[in-house]
């Protein structure tokens, strides 16, 4: 009987330790909220406020008040349907051969296509959307890398897919940004290195 009590106590302590460790890990991984901003219509109508608080404009692109119209944006209904049988989101890669500084040779999961797989699983499993993920290599023709024509090949292919799947409401051409070898587009969230995201 004493041995049984000892075993039960050990099991209980180890379970409590596991729950404590799990809670600590979850708290450490949680993203802390940013300070609250005044998001009144007047503030959102201010182009400089939007630019300074929500956007980073790359030096190779431009932005203007005409294409950052908050009032028009907020008036739109961006909600998606959650039908269980038809796709709502399409993900593809004009440049499927894009890799990262630490990608392993020949490992698809380390490429932008692998990022697409991960995004697909998040949108499907966590948010309940039906997602199509196209993995065609539009930037490889006859064994040669050709990124310039990839957009044309991808456009033709995606247009056909959209004709066959009119339920698709969002199309994402997912890329890894092309930058100089010594440039790393990362930021820090709660002390963890995190990739920056550009919506374009």
Q: Predicted regions: what is each one?
A:
Residues 104-119, 123-186:
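Catalytic-core regions of hydrolytic enzymes
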Residues 78-81, 159, 188-189:
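A generic local secondary-structure boundary/capping motif
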Residues 75, 84-86, 114, 126, ...:
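Extracytoplasmic
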Residues 34, 82, 93-95, 133, ...:
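Histidine (H) residue identity feature
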Residues 2-90:
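Non-catalytic propeptide/linker segments at domain boundaries
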Residues 88-93, 170-175, 198-200:
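Soluble periplasmic/extracytoplasmic beta-strand elements of cell-envelope proteins
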Residues 87-107:
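Short glycine-rich His-centered loop
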Residues 180-200:
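A short, glycine/acidic-enriched catalytic loop
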């Amino acid at each position: 009987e004493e041995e049984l009590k000892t075993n039960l106590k050990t099991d209980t302590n180890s379970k409590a330790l596991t729950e404590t460790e799990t809670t600590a890990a979850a708290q450490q991984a949680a993203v802390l909220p940013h300070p609250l901003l005044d998001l009144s219509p007047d503030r959102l109508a201010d182009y400089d406020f939007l630019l300074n608080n929500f956007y980073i404009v790359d030096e190779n692109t431009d932005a203007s008040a005409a294409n950052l119209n908050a009032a028009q944006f907020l008036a739109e209904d961006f909600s998606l349907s959650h039908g269980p049988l038809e796709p709502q989101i399409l993900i593809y890669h004009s440049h499927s051969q894009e890799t990262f500084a630490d990608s392993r040779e020949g490992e698809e999961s380390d490429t932008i296509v692998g990022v697409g797989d991960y995004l697909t699983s998040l949108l499907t499993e966590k948010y309940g959307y039906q997602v199509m993920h196209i993995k065609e290599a539009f930037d490889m023709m006859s064994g040669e890398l050709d990124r310039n024509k990839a957009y044309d090949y991808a456009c033709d292919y995606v247009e056909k897919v959209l004709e066959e799947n009119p339920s698709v409401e969002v199309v994402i051409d997912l890329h890894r940004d092309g930058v100089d070898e010594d440039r790393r587009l990362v930021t820090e969230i709660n002390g963890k290195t995190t990739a920056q995201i550009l919506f374009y």
